[in-house]
Amino acid sequence: MPKVEIYKSILLEKIGKNLTNYELESIIETAKAEICEIDIVNDKIKIEFNDTNRPDLWSSAGLARHIKTYLSGNVPSFDFFSMTDNLQKFYGEIFVSPEVFGIRPFIFGFLAKGMICDERMLEILIQLQEKLSHNYGQKRKRVAMGMYSSNLINFPINYVTCSSDYKFVPLGMDIEMSIKEINEKHPKGIEYSPIFENVDQYSLLLDYKNNVLSYPPIINSRDIGTLKVGDTNLFIEVTGTDLEATLLSLSIVACDLYDMGFKILPVKTVFPKETLFGKEIICPYYFQNSLKINVDSVNKLLGSNFTANDMCLDLKKLGISAYFEESDTFYIMPPVYRNDFLHEVDVIEEVMIGKGLDNFKSELPKDFTIGKLSPIEEFSRSVRNLMIGMGFQEMIYNYLGSKVDFIEKMNIKGSELLSVSNPMTESYEYIRGSIISDLLKSESISSNFPYPHKIFEIGKVALKDLVSDEGTVTYDNLAFLMADKEFSFNEINSLVSSLFYYLNIGFKVKESSKNLYIDGRGADILVNDIVLGSFGEVSPYILSNFGIMVPCCVLEININGLLH
């Protein structure tokens, strides 16, 4: 979970109230966080967050905003955000080339002016950059942030591609290095260049006079990408592969800098083709949607009897604009710096936090029951122990994923997969119908680890089912992957035989027609003449889609069918 260090004096100054340590500890719990350490000598507080859904809190400005809002009940306002029907004036432009749009497509930025950067402010900004890029940005793969002195930049900025031979002087060096040399020799290149595995073009940020700003998301240039004590005018950019995550990250930084005293000046990004929010986006940009909440649903889940007005007041303590037109429903507008409301239940949780947990009385259960493991869970544990005994490492994945990973890379039509009707992000728009894509994705980022690789997961998958009343069916599946240059169909066939031997289940195989496998190297598994799964050598075409260079063998089987 994210941990941050903040200056206590700066936090209290932003809150506008001199809270005791006890008061601070109590109110920080409303941010799903706890104080780990108070360093009186260095004026620092170490805080650990128990939730990764609130990156807006991972800074002194963001946490102070939360506490100040909770104490006052006043929703903060930011007048520099553009909306679909209310575009702000922009003070610079970023042009995205068609070539980079296929590699790392999204970039947004803004200018910040009016404050002098001292050592503490630089430390705060660098920590914010690291936490957003590493934690929320998945080690810069999903999102990464860059900071520059805007006095050195000639707008407009061009976001383009370059070859591995392109040279500039990177931050922390005194000599020119090619992109290839940065990837192989620079500490940041060694750490983050796997983001660009199996590509021959790399992202590059240039100003109007072709001065290099950075090689995002790897390293800034030494000349323009160095922030120093005394700088007053900043340019902030965020690049990423997820549109909404990139926009949200930029919004968080803009709000933090505004709360620190900067004036925020919007910048327009021009894309080569349409995005979800248009071809031209002026940022910071408010993209979140309103939610309609049923009052009865809130009271039923909380065991309360609150009115719509009560709930709206409680939500405002969390910075959430809420209003009601009728007594049985109300509407909320997420704050500009939040995008974690996926369901009505998320809003109900905020009502509970706003009301205060102390205001809910504890109740003993009315019924007494004895719990026990379900048959499928007992069987799953047996299978899990067998897999671990055969040298496999267990993985745990999300059930939601992207169309790219679940359909396009797997080379399937996807007609049986379930899609989310209103996904908050493209990364979670489909419910998985197979575990194999997750295993292949893990293998694609594991090439630096010694072979052989042997991983597995026992988890749920869901598919359309026109026969059932719900229209869907959920299975518990076992899937495993073996990766090594020596692995072939013979090895996985032997392992499957061992697995079924120890489970004491008879089975048959027949040649599989799935395009997941190399022709003649895949087999369907039949138990009592019913196909429950398959195994084989993965097709080179699918391996190349995931950027995997080593032969892989996979199995996936429905363990509900094995149990029954």
Swiss-Prot record:
Its EC number is 6.1.1.20. It is found in: Cytoplasm. Mg(2+) binds at D340, D346, E349, E350. It comes from the Bacteria. It catalyses: tRNA(Phe) + L-phenylalanine + ATP = L-phenylalanyl-tRNA(Phe) + AMP + diphosphate + H(+). Pfam families: B5, tRNA_synthFbeta. One of its GO terms (biological process) is phenylalanyl-tRNA aminoacylation. One of its GO terms (cellular component) is phenylalanine-tRNA ligase complex. InterPro entries: aa-tRNA-synth_II/BPL/LPL, DNA-bd_dom_put_sf, Phe-tRNA-ligase_IIc_bsu, Phe-tRNA-synth_IIc_bsu_arc_euk, Phe-tRNA_synthase-like_B3/B4, Phe_tRNA_ligase_beta2_arc, PheRS_beta_core, tRNA_synthase_B5-dom. NCBIfam families: pheT_arch. Tetramer of two alpha and two beta subunits. This is Phenylalanine--tRNA ligase beta subunit. It comes from Borrelia duttonii (strain Ly). The lineage of its organism: Bacteria, Pseudomonadati, Spirochaetota, Spirochaetia, Spirochaetales. The gene is pheT.
